Amino acid sequence: MRSDMIKKGDHQAPARSLLHATGALKNPTDMNKPFVAICNSYIDIVPGHVHLRELADIAKEAIREAGAIPFEFNTIGVDDGIAMGHIGMRYSLPSREIIADAAETVINAHWFDGVFYIPNCDKITPGMLLAAVRTNVPAIFCSGGPMKAGLSAQGKALTLSSMFEAVGAFKEGKLSKEAFLDMEQNACPTCGSCAGMFTANSMNCLMEVLGLALPYNGTALAVSEQRREMIREAAFKLVDNIKKDIKPLDIVTREAIDDAFALDMAMGGSTNTVLHTLAIANEAGIDYDLERINEIAKKTPYLSKIAPSSSYSMHDVHEAGGCPAIINELMKKEGTLHPDRLTVTGKTLRENNEGKEIKNFDVIHSLDDPYDKQGGLSILFGNIAPKGAVIKVGGVDPSIKIFTGKAICFNSHDEAVEAIDNKIVREGHVVVIRYEGPKGGPGMPEMLAPTSSIVGRGLGKDVALITDGRFSGATRGIAVGHISPEAASGGPIGLIKDGDEVTIDLINRTLNVNQTKEELNHRKEALQPFKAKVKSGYLARYTALVTSANTGGIMQVPENLI
């Protein structure tokens, strides 16, 4: 066993003394059992994580019943909704790397035989997944689950995205103070990740099709008994996989990454999934071309529109059959998935999901009646984004295939929000927000406030927004993010001027400014070099090492320093 490194031999008597002092070893034979880390992310300012201490206790009990010894440790967590729109958002994406590094440190320092990961919200799941792939120790994921959707006094279903858009509507006088406060009190009624197909739930659904979590991991409610039963089942599976030596890199293959994007397309997941999945591919040593994502989109039908793209919540999806029903439907179209891959259940993806039929065709459409014949995400290329950009086409009004407008440029999120609030941004504008990428932000903050204000003001079909920053999974409208290279790295988004004509073509998947190559080169010669905004602390180190979004926004040590 891997843990023999810290518990076998006379020379490890001091380590054994310390292990006895933990109280985790109940009898002499326990030293001969596998040591399992529970990598938890309990934190009580994050509603998606307030209940994870209880789930960890269930996991501990089940791991012990299965014949192994559990030890729990915690990672940090950032609530993107609370950190939104201020300096706190600079720390959200960078927290992913801290989580990965922290988990790697504990797992390798103590030579655990297996790891039970309990994530839930936005950066925690991908951070833990980076650690799982990096350490390649037998692992299983069981998230905390989504919260219930809220309900307004008028009986309207609510999610957190409803609240962000309500801010714009309230400022426009389209929503009364009473209705505004009612929504605030009722949008988030329980613990769990936010109720729509936002980043947290998108990633937790993808864990199912990647093969590192049990079926229904992405949709079973946080407050449900099924969630607790799933924790127990996952614990027994993990201990069995330790004995069989099934590791993450046996499961996370190029085909698994393909299938993750296919499910993402079918569910219209968050654009952040592209960022995180590319980072996972990089960590797994898989060279993954962005154009491959478009090829997957072309052959994957869009089957389930979930909030913010509709009024349906994750609970509605669960009741309609969950991810297993969507995966089963996709398997009926040959070439869409790779169903004979190994998963953490010890069975194939096909065996996990075959026969799981759709229970409500309003929530999950069939192959014969998709929302669209192509997936809900697209990668755009062009002279603004030579290395790619991402748009959630499932969140764009279906009538819009090509949008051309006049650029109105801002070098920060805050400048753009002020202009939108002051009605400087008008119909026909393409809002350009730059120097908000991984390096420029720093931290690639989410642009939820400006997109929500645009939609809340009723301009969702009349104003577009493009940025080298990113979006919340709650974003909808004509919103293009992850533009690469970013402005801080000399990307052409930094060359756009007010009044330039910008075209977003969803048919041909292009993003261009109507300027000649010569003019753009002339502008580049006059461009001032980017100066880092933060000079000390973690964000200064992050700025120095982070790459653009087309590589997943990973931190990379320059080769000349290795």
UniProtKB/Swiss-Prot annotation:
Mg(2+) binds at residues 80, 122-123, 446. Its cofactor is [2Fe-2S] cluster; Mg(2+). The keyword Iron applies. GO terms for biological process: isoleucine biosynthetic process; L-valine biosynthetic process. The modification N6-carboxylysine is found at residue 123. Pathway: Amino-acid biosynthesis; L-isoleucine biosynthesis; L-isoleucine from 2-oxobutanoate: step 3/4; Amino-acid biosynthesis; L-valine biosynthesis; L-valine from pyruvate: step 3/4. Transmembrane segments: none annotated. Keywords: 2Fe-2S, Amino-acid biosynthesis, Branched-chain amino acid biosynthesis, Iron, Iron-sulfur, Lyase, Magnesium, Metal-binding. InterPro entries: Dihydro-acid_dehy_C, DihydroxyA_deHydtase, DiOHA_6PGluconate_deHydtase_CS, ILV_EDD_C, ILV_EDD_N, IlvD/EDD_N. PROSITE patterns: ILVD_EDD_1, ILVD_EDD_2. Belongs to the IlvD/Edd family. Homodimer. Functions in the biosynthesis of branched-chain amino acids. Catalyzes the dehydration of (2R,3R)-2,3-dihydroxy-3-methylpentanoate (2,3-dihydroxy-3-methylvalerate) into 2-oxo-3-methylpentanoate (2-oxo-3-methylvalerate) and of (2R)-2,3-dihydroxy-3-methylbutanoate (2,3-dihydroxyisovalerate) into 2-oxo-3-methylbutanoate (2-oxoisovalerate), the penultimate precursor to L-isoleucine and L-valine, respectively. This is Dihydroxy-acid dehydratase. It comes from Staphylococcus haemolyticus (strain JCSC1435). The lineage of its organism: Bacteria, Bacillati, Bacillota, Bacilli, Bacillales.
